[in-house]
């Protein structure tokens, strides 16, 4: 069964894709379950972004009905994790019209991670430690999200990938994040977008996936992070084989905020 658990359309600020075009592309690629997960990032400055939930849900429900015999459409959202804004993040994620929420670290100290890391020079270790410490705080304190998105998202945006700190230097804080994820039954996302953003791996990298398995983690979903119809489901054949080789036995997705597990065959 092919499931793409993370895609974007024109309700996100960084996509212009028509939702129906995404659906048609998914059907063409024999994807049985397609999740729309458009961006919401709540920060205390001009980066703050939220879309019209009512319009989004109305449009997607119409498409869901139109294509119900060909594909299962899930209505999700990628919520930017930011513990300082939990007062608005958590009520939004209580909306039961959504099938699920991905929690992702797009900002740190109310600043865009991608822009910040591109400007930085020197040793990035302190930034990495702070990034994962804040991720730990978010997982511990934020209620209502079901999937932890592209954990090592920060890796994508170093201009010189050789400057990514050695994993052993921040392994302990990543382990703390993963232990909390496991305890809270949050699903870890494997996002093939990393392969297409200058990395030789999906997000998260194998160091994190192997640590997750070593700690007893089993729940994982597979996502393209597509912002264009042509990118839906890309890299999935290789990704599925890779996850199986690492010992994962099933994929998890959410419908009506309830987990559904399917064999990873």
Regions found by a protein language model. Give the residues of each.
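Charged catalytic cores and adjacent phosphate/nucleic-acid-binding surfaces used
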Residues: 1-9, 19, 109, 161-265
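An N-terminally biased module of ancient metal coordination in phosphate/nucleic-acid-related enzymes
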Residues: 1-88, 92-95, 99, 157, ...
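Non-cysteine beta-strand/loop elements that form the S-adenosyl-L-methionine
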Residues: 34-37, 98-107, 147-151, 189
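Short connector loops/turns at beta-strand edges and beta->alpha or beta->beta junctions
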Residues: 39, 106-110, 153-154, 217
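Histidine/acidic residue-rich metal-binding segments in metalloenzymes
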Residues: 53-65, 72-74, 91-97, 123-147, ...
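Surface-exposed cleft-lining segments at the edges of enzyme active sites
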Residues: 114-127, 155-166
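Active-site rim beta-loop-alpha module in soluble metabolic enzymes
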Residues: 150-159, 185
């Amino acid at each position: 069964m092919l499931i793409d658990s993370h895609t974007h359309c024109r309700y996100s600020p960084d996509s212009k894709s028509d939702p129906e075009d995404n659906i048609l592309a998914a059907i063409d690629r024999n994807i049985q379950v397609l999740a729309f997960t458009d961006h919401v990032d709540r920060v205390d400055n001009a980066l703050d972004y939220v879309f019209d939930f009512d319009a989004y849900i109305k449009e997607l429900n119409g498409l869901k009905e139109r294509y119900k015999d060909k594909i299962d459409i899930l209505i999700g959202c990628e919520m930017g994790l930011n513990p300082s804004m939990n007062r608005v993040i958590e009520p939004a994620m209580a909306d039961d019209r959504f099938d699920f929420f991905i929690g992702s670290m797009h900002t740190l100290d109310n600043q865009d991670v991608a822009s910040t890391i591109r400007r930085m020079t020197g040793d990035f270790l302190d930034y990495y430690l702070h990034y994962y410490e804040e991720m730990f705080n978010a997982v511990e304190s934020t209620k209502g999200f079901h999937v932890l998105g592209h954990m090592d998202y920060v890796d994508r945006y170093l201009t010189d990938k050789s400057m990514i700190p050695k994993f052993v230097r921040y392994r302990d804080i990543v382990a703390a994040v993963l232990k909390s994820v496991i305890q809270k039954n949050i699903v870890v996302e494997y996002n093939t977008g990393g392969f297409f953003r200058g990395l030789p791996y999906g997000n998260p990298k194998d160091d994190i996936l192997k640590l997750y398995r070593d700690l007893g983690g089993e729940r994982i979903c597979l996502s393209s992070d597509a912002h264009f119809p042509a990118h839906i489901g890309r890299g999935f054949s290789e990704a599925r084989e890779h996850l199986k080789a690492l010992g994962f036995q099933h994929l998890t997705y959410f419908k009506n905020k309830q987990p559904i597990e399917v064999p990873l065959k």
